[in-house]
């Protein structure tokens, strides 16, 4: 047994971080700065909570659902497994994917676990089509399996949303399409509208959050170091009154001997002076 170490599973946030297609940028002002005031004081004048690594609250999609300040801290903490389920261009995470990946983790998935799903897309985190426009995602069947069969506490994805991109208003749902080119590309590739294959608006959001199962989007940081492992997990929110979700600091508490040591430390190109 090695010592316990903390592994950051979060992307940095701030001005310049990658943005979901409809999200506005951070606007940050320096009210005081060192040369003049001998202190630094910054204000966020425009701050989108559904940015970078964040947890959605039920009120985000469920009428009269719980707001962030109403959720107990226990919801954001507990034993976890990180499943290695490689996915790419518009692929779906299936029930079979989850069950097969769980067999490779100590103890499998147990009732009340957090399940962190590592598709490898965290490595493409950036303002590019791979991460956003062509994002894979969780199938309806897999979401139901996690909630009703496996009875998990929460699910975190290294993806742009809890849902496949074609279940969102980036495509044909709600006020969409915010990214009309993916609709045209899908029609050219498959010969029909994506709406035929992805008819519901954010079904995975509704399945998870509608049953008080937590959901985290954009898991990142050094998640590749804990892939295939069991550990303790936390992703505590800001105590935002009436919030529908907040940026979180997702962290794995794990024995250092269990780390995937061939994975280098994650270095981000943005947020570097």
For each feature predicted by the language model, list its residue ranges:
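Active-/binding-site microenvironments in catalytic and ligand-binding cores
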Residues: 1-273
């Amino acid at each position: 047994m090695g010592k316990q170490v903390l592994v950051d599973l979060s992307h940095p946030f701030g001005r310049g971080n990658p943005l979901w297609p409809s999200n506005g940028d951070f606007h940050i002002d320096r009210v005081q700065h060192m040369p003049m005031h001998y202190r630094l004081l910054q204000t966020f004048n425009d701050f989108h909570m559904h940015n970078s690594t964040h947890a959605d609250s039920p009120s985000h999609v469920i009428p009269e659902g719980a707001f962030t300040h109403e959720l107990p801290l226990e919801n954001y903490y507990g034993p976890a497994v990180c499943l290695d389920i490689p996915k790419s261009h518009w692929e779906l995470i299936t029930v079979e994917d989850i069950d097969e990946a769980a067999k490779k983790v100590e103890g499998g998935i147990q009732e009340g676990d957090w399940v962190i799903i590592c598709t490898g897309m965290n490595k493409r985190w950036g303002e590019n089509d791979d991460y956003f426009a062509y994002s894979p995602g969780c199938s309806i069947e897999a979401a139901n399996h996690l909630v009703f069969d496996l009875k998990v506490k929460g699910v975190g994805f290294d993806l742009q949303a809890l849902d496949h991109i074609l279940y969102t208003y980036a495509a044909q749902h709600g006020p969409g399409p915010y990214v009309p080119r993916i609709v045209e590309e899908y029609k050219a590739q498959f010969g029909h509208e994506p709406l035929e294959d992805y008819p519901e608006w954010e079904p995975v959001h509704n399945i998870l959050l509608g049953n008080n199962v937590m959901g985290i989007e954009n898991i990142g940081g050094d998640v590749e170091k804990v892939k295939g492992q069991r550990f303790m997990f936390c992703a505590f929110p800001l105590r935002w009154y009436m919030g529908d979700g907040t940026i979180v600091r997702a962290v794995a508490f794990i024995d250092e001997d269990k780390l995937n040591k061939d994975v280098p430390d994650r270095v981000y190109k943005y947020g570097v002076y």
